From Swiss-Prot:
Source species of the chain: Solanum tuberosum (Potato)
InterPro entries for this protein: COpept_A_inh-like, Proteinase_amylase_inhib_sf
Swiss-Prot/TrEMBL keywords: Disulfide bond, Knottin, Metalloenzyme inhibitor, Pyrrolidone carboxylic acid
Name of protein: Metallocarboxypeptidase inhibitor
Domain notes: The presence of a 'disulfide through disulfide knot' structurally defines this protein as a knottin.
């Protein structure tokens, strides 16, 4: 079971804005929020 990441769902402008997260490190530009990393 994954714990919610504190950076998940935070606003972002670039991928690096989410780089401190474990489970939510991708920046979805359409929504401008961090989301689960997709390899």
């Amino acid at each position: 079971q994954q714990h919610a990441d504190p950076i998940c769902n935070k606003p972002c402008k670039t991928h690096d804005d989410c780089s401190g997260a474990w489970f939510c490190q991708a920046c979805w530009n359409s929504a401008r929020t961090c989301g689960p990393y997709v390899g």
